[in-house]
Amino acid sequence: MLGKIKPLSFPRDYDEFLSDEKNRRLLAAYREGMNATNVFYQALTFAKVIEGMTKTIPRPDNSGAIDSRRRYMSTRIPAELSDLPVTSNEIVETFRPFLGKKFSWVREHFRPLVRNAIAHLDPDEDTLDIDRIKDVQTCERAVPVLRYIARSLLLQGFEDWSNKATQHGST
């Protein structure tokens, strides 16, 4: 993969955020994706973070949850390539089909790739194969987008957690 990757950093009080087991597990999965050398594994772990973060977003039956849920559902890939925090032109181009799209739409777009083609192996079906360059390239194009969404959701989750902790006087 080409491009400069910005380290994931949290503002003050991050240690309390990290002490929550769910948060630690999500951050561990993100770290696994960042450190993996296999693009199939990167795609799978970033998809796991996205899935996990969407499950941590409060459902509308909880207090204050409607705003959090609405915020996630409306979070989008930037509409302009220049608004992406990516320096490599090659990687920026992988975002073009997703410009302005909601995270939830992009997540559903990649579901067949990650869930079916990577996570499962059915000898009778056409699944991704690490020995086919076309399949490796498919994952290479997906990983920057999945990484961007996973990172954005983690940061959004931290912000939501931090705001909730501040409201309850625990910071």
What are these regions (language model features)?
Residues 7-171:
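Amphipathic, oligomerization/interface secondary-structure segments
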